[in-house]
Amino acid sequence: MPDLLLELFSEEIPARMQARAREDLKKLVTDGLVEAGLTYAGAGVFSTPRRLVLAIEGLSGESRAVREERKGPKSDAPEAAIEGFLRSTGLSRDQLELRDDKKGQVFFAVFERPGRAAPAIVAEVVESVIRNFPWPKSMRWGSGSLRWVRPLQSILCILGDEGSAEIVPVTVDRLTASNTTCGHRFLAPARFPVSSFDDYTAKLRRAFVMLDSAEREAHIWNDATNQAFANGLEVVPDAGLLTEVAGLVEWPVVLLGKIGEAFLGLPPEVLQTSMREHQKFFSVRAKSGRIEGFVTVANTVTKDHGATILAGNQKVLSARLSDAKFFWENDVAVAKAGMADWADGLKSVTFHNKLGSQFDRIERIAALAAEIAPLVGADAVEAALAARTAKLDLRSSMVGEFPELQGKMGRYYAAEAGLSPAVANAARDHYAPLGPSDAVPSDPVSVAVALADKIDTLTGFWAIDEKPTGSKDPFALRQMGRASCRERVLLMG
């Protein structure tokens, strides 16, 4: 039984689209082959930034011959009914069979469909899949009609069996399938032929391409952690970033760098978020927990072992962190002045056109937190103060740049303003839990503010008839309801 190897080679595929594209390619091709009458033993799918690859083992050489029967009208039925049956089947009357039935003789149409060779079926299925591939975003280029996520440059499609390989005659616009591909864009750009999946993967590795994304992830993580350990440091785990970076490189080369002394005083969340979002760097911390370095992943091998790449990355990182330091210092100055400017600024920020501004909402939450405080063992005055402070960081420069830091920065700013640890922690913890695995706040002040925040949101949206429906919940009210239930259950012991 032959094995199928399909490679769709293009310009860089966005990392965020690769996992879905792998699954779509596998499902669409295998479903199409099975629907056409072929069977297979197994299928694997792979991706790099420049290629989607499908390998199918044990594909049947041809589809089975099929005999189909279709029951028609009785022999004494009106002529119009018989003519309609003939038109629908495309047969003439003398091609129909008469068979005895309980109600008399009935016409039957019999179709004999011979088996088809696998190459012809594969060519049809692959062409259809390429033309109708469900990319979230796609583009056209040149004068052709084909749409792809980035310009599709070549198609490799072969059926191999016992050492021989046959090129499948796939043609899409001006692209015709071949048995050749190429390696790394810079390290091995020349094209070369392949005869099987094993031959393909071996030659790609010699051409500086690591085909399996899981292997690239493991290589990046192992090399990064080993380099950090050798320097008495550790890499901050980040599974999402690891997957993304593995989708940006074909031949990962891990480089360990240092953060400039001028930026080591920034909060670790700021350093980590800035490096992750802007540079796709992993954060590296000392045993004390302070972030002191970073890991970047290059896509090439250099004669100076990455020194030039690392120097360039450190220069860009310094510029990014200079911005973050500027935001931090300005925000700290506002915090030490009492954060009144931020509170006034929230008066012009609409929470919902039927529920007022963020300032109005904060006042409601503060009043409610003061009512809840005695029930959870918190001081009412402190709970109200925490509620009025918790969302002020929404007007800060840092949260404006990195919205995901809301609450976390609020804790730092409350501390800089000289407020109590309970008030500062409430700024960070009142958003929790954000998911089923998140911890529920335990400090009484944080619990009072967290419950008040969620209750105000839920009752407010119910009051204006913005309830979640079966398929829509734009304000995440279900999640908020579950979170408030978890908080109440915790309080009940």
Question: Which positions does each model-derived feature cover?
Answer:
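Hydrophobic alpha-helical segments, chiefly the membrane-spanning helices
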Residues: 489-493
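Amphipathic alpha-helical "coupling" segments that flank catalytic cores
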Residues: 1-488
